Amino acid sequence: TSRNYLAAAYGYDNRQLQDELRTFGSSTEKHSNALHLGIVGNSRGMGSYTGYSALYYTGRLTYDDINVGNEGTYHKFNTDINHIQRLGHTVNLHINLHSQLASKDLDGSEQFSLGGADGIRAYPQGEASGSSGYQATAELRYATSIANLSLATFIDCGEVELNKNIGDHRNLAGWGVGVQYARPNDYYLRVDYARNLNGEAYQSEENDKNGRVWFLAYKLF
């Protein structure tokens, strides 16, 4: 049997932000107001689960003191798809896809980033940020004989448009292995080791030729 869920999602976001340039001892205040509308849902079948969302945002960003070219009205469309497929008694396949399509070059607070613990793990947090892009992950998880402990191997990839006016893009890809321990409704621990696949160097910090390690911990209260 299968079970499906679908709902409308809508809301209003108001944010008061501040950009600090510590080197120059200056800061800029900015304000963002946005409406979003879309759908969220999931589908459960025999040995599978799929969750998804599609949200359209329309908003306006204003700066208090200066105009850096990214203020004004903007529109963007975000999608998220997460699929889990059971391949056997101890193996599951996890596929994640995230994307953003924007009408213009966006302020950094609205941009889409590829690198990081929840993105392409071979790259630093926030690496390769732009207004439009996608990021995908395919991961195999193996349940061990130790309760709540599993091993993983994964591939991450993605592309982002850095500047709409000149069509500048970056493509990143990486692979890695991980181990996680999860206590349902209590806490979650995970360690990942990742290396890049296409030789694309870091731009946000010095290159790390020996790979990258991430440690994540979540606690439910």
Residue spans of the language-model regions?
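Outer-membrane beta-barrel "beta-signal"
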Residues: 179-186, 191, 208-221
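Short glycine-rich, acidic/polar surface loops and turns
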Residues: 137-139, 174-180
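Polar, glycine-rich mid-to-C-terminal structural blocks
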Residues: 2-4, 9-11, 18
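C-terminal outer-membrane beta-barrel translocator/porin domains of Gram-negative envelope proteins
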Residues: 16-149, 153-162, 206
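Soluble periplasmic/extracytoplasmic beta-strand elements of cell-envelope proteins
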Residues: 7-11, 53-55, 98, 190, ...
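Outer-membrane beta-barrel translocator/channel fold
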Residues: 15-24, 189, 193-212
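Glycine-rich, small/acidic residue-mixed loop/short-helix segments
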Residues: 169-172
